Amino acid sequence: MIVDHIGNLSDALKGKKSTFALVIGTTDVSLIPGITVAGATPELTMFTPAADAEYLITGSCKVIKGVPVTPDGIPTPALLSRASLSLINVNKLVVNAGARVTPKIPFVDLHGEPGRDIRKGGVRKEVAENIIANATVLGENLSEEVLVVGESIPAGTTTAAAVLTGLGFNGVEIVSSSSPNNPKELKRKVVEEAVRSAPRDTTERIYWLADPVILAVAGLAMGFRGLTILAGGTQMAAVSAVIKELSPEKLNSVGIITTKWIINDTTARLMELVKTLGVKLSHANLDLSQSQHEGLRVYERGFVKEGVGAGGAMALAMANGVTSENLVKKIDAFYSDLINAQR
């Protein structure tokens, strides 16, 4: 079931032709120990986006063995996205905004570059402008009625917090985490240092505090002529804030769809921010507590929560008649395949 909070995105998805785009990139912020669990070690976070893309499209990873996992061994949310999209007829596309490791599958390259540590400037101005311009052109040339955009970038909630803070919001208090223990004090320290050194000009400030994925997703939404679904949590709220600064008229055709685990996250304040921005918000209401696998049941305890467009992918499946029961069965089956492949 899709639950609408602001607007009526559940109806807007029904019977529409859709493209699912996964935007990947990296930021050197993910190398800060303790800032993210989107990889077994800080160094392996550089492989996570490429591996997520490979698994989403092909069902296996080439840049690493197995699939991306947290330090606790919990698998990537790409599992949820791939299972959901396998049940419906939808075009899939991988977009490289600036990943240090690129996937060994076909992808669209925006000619960006990996994000730097935001304390020293996240994305160079000329690179940022190039990413946004190329993403906008790509968006303009996608012809379906609905564009669902997911993301994979470890430490993306920290760069999102920085962008939101730079735009006048209490960013660290707003954003979620892939861990049940949101490392807010570490995020706050990094964000405050980055904001102190950021330029005063609003656009240049965004570039300084952002990562390549935030900029690319904003560009895609600004170029696309139909309804853009930002499939993610608080990172997509930061994208919405960027769109509001750069192309405010586009917000009318933008909505966020996330997971219930983001909506229920008591360490974040997504709903409050989205209301302020004036963006539509819904979530895919899936319960994994009855899954066959402990690695999936832990989602109900606040692990991982969202990523690789999981909420939007599940919502697409639900809008096309897939029941929650069948979706859980498919996710379980894909998880079993992963386990068997590693034996």
UniProtKB/Swiss-Prot annotation:
It comes from the Archaea. CDD domains: DMB-PRT_CobT. Transmembrane segments: none annotated. GO terms for molecular function: nicotinate-nucleotide-dimethylbenzimidazole phosphoribosyltransferase activity. HAMAP family: UPF0284. Belongs to the UPF0284 family. This is UPF0284 protein Msed_0735.
